[in-house]
């Protein structure tokens, strides 16, 4: 019943107006699934390769679609093994990770459709716990998402005390609105960056003050704890020639960067710090984790790129204590699950994440619930972000 009989591929727009790949998968019993690939702005050096959409579609039609016809959509590993075999490389550089992940997600949805089950139930299996992920909401952004704003790429609201998914989602939206109010009171104009966060032309130090004040205001209104966190995207700050982290006119050595981040964790009680150091510096990650990992999440995104080999190296060296999970970094849901399983076995928290160039696809909301992830990072406002947040609210309402 779940045998794949047809796959359609097309170009659609992502949230930045760039073309991306969308896949439809049809089974012999009429099961249908659709998936669309996101795209990152600050991409890790070791991510799976995204090809131009037209090229990726042409290669997938030629090499992957014939292999997939007749494969059981309900056997996710078989689907993803067929994609790997069709590509023949370690990084999907032949057909493109954008086509691979779109097909992988669409096949999972088609299988769930045949079963008449929500995607999170189909994916969950033994993983599914009783908890729901806490949304991390991007409220101030800079870096690769908004070049004229802060050096730090993301300031994230973290409603850790919210009694429900719904209240957490609305708390993040309230912090986003409160940031606008604080900026207005200070006479600071602000456009929005790639992910819908405010992108004011202010220093990092001023941004900390603004976000801290906004969080305090909303926390007082809602009556539960809200902390905040950072995505520093430090690989984008690190200059190989200078062997230093460059913040405009200021540079920091690796030791100074570690001290800087540790001080921020203490001063602002940060709940989460993503990519605080360069993606190749496992030793520095380990040193920072040893210093502050007992009171905050030190998360590897560019460090790990949802890759089990890189995660294992982090586990062996004590680098970070959590991993950002992005299916398109590795190319298939099966590879994504392998990274999540390895993290869980070794006590690493998992954070399921969107990309800066997104679509209305809601797979990651289901993936976060299915795998009992502690957090989901999928923005705060904007249709491609609220699609996932609203789906998370619906899932929680359905599952409770």
UniProtKB/Swiss-Prot annotation:
Highest taxon of source: Archaea
* One of the GO biological process terms: glycolytic process
Q: What residue stretch is flagged as signal peptide?
A: none
Q: What is its EC number?
A: 4.2.1.11
Q: Which sites bind Mg(2+)?
A: 231, 274, 301
GO MF, one term, reads:
magnesium ion binding
What's its catalytic activity?
(2R)-2-phosphoglycerate = phosphoenolpyruvate + H2O
Keyword annotations: Cytoplasm, Glycolysis, Lyase, Magnesium, Metal-binding, Secreted
Cofactor note (record): Binds a second Mg(2+) ion via substrate during catalysis.
**Intracellular or extracellular location(s):** Cytoplasm; Secreted; Cell surface
Positions that bind (2R)-2-phosphoglycerate: 153, 326, 355-356, 377
Names of required cofactors: Mg(2+)
- CDD domains listed in its UniProt record: enolase
Show the active-site residues: 195, 326
A GO CC annotation given for this chain: extracellular region
- Quote the pathway field: Carbohydrate degradation; glycolysis; pyruvate from D-glyceraldehyde 3-phosphate: step 4/5
InterPro entries in alphabetical order: Enolase (IPR000941), Enolase-like_C_sf (IPR036849), Enolase-like_N (IPR029017), Enolase_C (IPR020810), Enolase_CS (IPR020809), Enolase_N (IPR020811)
Protein's job: Catalyzes the reversible conversion of 2-phosphoglycerate (2-PG) into phosphoenolpyruvate (PEP). It is essential for the degradation of carbohydrates via glycolysis.
Instruction: Output the NCBIfam families linked to this UniProt entry.
Output: eno (TIGR01060)
Q: Which family does it belong to?
A: Belongs to the enolase family.
Name used for this protein in its record: Enolase
Species per Swiss-Prot/TrEMBL record = Halorubrum lacusprofundi (strain ATCC 49239 / DSM 5036 / JCM 8891 / ACAM 34)
